[in-house]
A protein has these predicted regions:
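Short S/T/G/P-rich N-terminal loop/turn motif that feeds into the first structured element of a domain
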Residues: 1-52, 59-70, 79-114
Length: 114
């Protein structure tokens, strides 16, 4: 099984960045307490805090699915803070590919690397 990376890009609705930050703090607590296969989870904001990026690294597809299960209750509220796009990078399992089907998440498989 190969490492999977995720990128979620947010453009916040007016007045929603503080809500995003509050919810992300809760997500981070869950990630630290429950996720086993999460290697990296970083939340970035641009200078005027109108946009954010969540960068995620997981040991494998199973770790992504585990993470989604742990934070699932918070996702609807987080997605309501702005418009969101997402990408998965790597070789996701058939189960993860099926789980993301229809979600708007784009999957990018390796082409060249070193």
């Amino acid at each position: 099984m190969s490492e999977i990376q995720g990128v979620a890009r947010f453009t916040f609705h007016e007045g929603k960045v503080e809500e995003f930050k509050r919810l992300c703090a809760q997500v981070m607590d869950v990630v630290r307490a429950k996720d086993i296969g999460t290697l990296q989870y970083v939340i970035y904001l641009n200078d005027d805090q109108s946009e954010g990026v969540v960068y995620e690294r997981y040991q494998n597809s199973e770790a992504v699915i585990e993470h989604a299960t742990h934070v699932g209750d918070l996702m609807e509220a987080i997605f309501a803070t702005g418009s969101v796009s997402g990408e998965l990078l790597g070789e996701p399992s058939a189960e993860l590919t099926a789980a993301t089907a229809g979600s708007g998440v784009s999957i990018f498989r390796p082409f060249l690397s070193m």
